[in-house]
Structure formats: structure tokens, C-alpha cells
Design a protein with these regions (language model features):
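Short alpha-helical "recognition helix" segments of helix-turn-helix
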Residues: 60-65, 72
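Residues at alpha-helix boundaries and the short loops/turns that link adjacent helices
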Residues: 20-24, 36, 55
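Short, amphipathic alpha-helical "recognition" segments used to contact nucleic acids or chromatin
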Residues: 42-56
């Protein structure tokens, strides 16, 4: 975990997110706390990660999501060398299906 982001403010943000009970509450909270572009960028990264795990090419991902190759590369680096956060979320999402 990155010590630079481990602050009381970030802890409070995560506690707020964990208090949300459903998708509608997520929309309400995230529309208030994020700009539309910030929220769309986060959603785009999650979609890029999903496509990378499915072995989709950078070109196909860029065409499908509109993500730049720099964004795709950054997400790919997180998938390979990150904290396994994407993997944890995808695993839990698959169990819910």
C-alpha cells in the first residue's frame, strides 16, 4: 500500500464509500463528489482492465473505450505490478454473477 495516500482523509473517503448500500446510492454520492469526467475516467479504467484480462489488444481497447494507449499502458502496469486490487474486485464481481 502506498504510504503517500494512506491518510485520515483517504480513510474517511473509503469509509464513506463502504457505507453505500446499492448502485443508486453510489450514483448519488459519486455524482456529488466527482466531476462527470473524473467518474467516466475511473469507469473507463475498470473497463480497460477487464478487456486487458480478456487479452484484448490495445488497438481494440482504444477503439471500444476511447482510452489512450497511455491509459491502457498504465492500467496494464497496475494489473501486472500493482496491489492486485483489480483482480480482487473482478473475482468478487464474478462471484456475484
Amino acid at each position: 500500500m502506498n504510504d503517500k495516500i494512506k491518510t485520515e482523509s483517504v480513510d474517511n473517503l473509503f469509509e464513506a464509500i463502504l457505507s453505500l448500500k446499492n448502485t443508486e446510492e453510489c450514483y448519488m454520492f459519486f455524482e456529488d463528489i466527482c466531476t462527470i469526467n473524473e467518474l467516466l475516467a475511473i469507469a473507463q479504467r475498470l473497463e480497460v482492465a477487464k478487456l486487458l484480462k480478456e487479452q484484448t489488444t490495445y488497438i481494440e481497447i482504444s477503439e471500444e473505450t476511447g482510452a489512450s494507449t497511455a491509459t491502457i499502458s498504465r492500467v496494464n502496469r497496475s494489473l501486472k505490478y500493482g496491489n492486485d486490487g483489480y483482480e480482487m474486485v473482478f473475482s468478487r464481481m464474478n462471484k456475484q454473477d
